[in-house]
Amino acid sequence: MTGYFLPPQTSSYTFRFAKVDDSAILSVGGDVAFGCCAQEQPPITSTNFTINGIKPWQGRLPDNIAGTVYMYAGFYCPMKIVYSNAVSWHTLPVSVELPDVTTVSDDFAGHVYSFDDDLTAQLYYP
């Protein structure tokens, strides 16, 4: 999943995967998720993930794996989630804690947007 997170306030935002089965990464930022106006292009090969969770074959990951990113209000910030699952059915619960301590879970309407690659608006790149 790719999109642009629009922070309502200038502050730190904590993204969280409640449970990962089998692997998931979250990348936030222009040099990590995807380049300016390149949401539909091949991925950047950065391994500087905001959250990196890969479950061992014979074990499990801790719950609530989190990563925090500082963002500026009103600037669209690229984000990408890559999720894989093997053997059995599962989902990836995703949430973000806003500066006012409100938690947004799974439905990111009003927070994450998608645009054509010819976007001309200002984007934030940390």
UniProtKB/Swiss-Prot annotation:
Domain of life: Eukaryota
Residue stretches making up the PA14 domain: 1-110
Phenotype on disruption: Leads to cell death when overexpressing the camptothecin mimetic TOP1-T(722)A mutant.
Family per similarity comment: Belongs to the flocculin family.
Record's protein name: Topoisomerase I damage affected protein 8
Species of origin: Saccharomyces cerevisiae (strain ATCC 204508 / S288c) (Baker's yeast)
Lineage, uppermost ranks: Eukaryota, Fungi, Dikarya, Ascomycota, Saccharomycotina
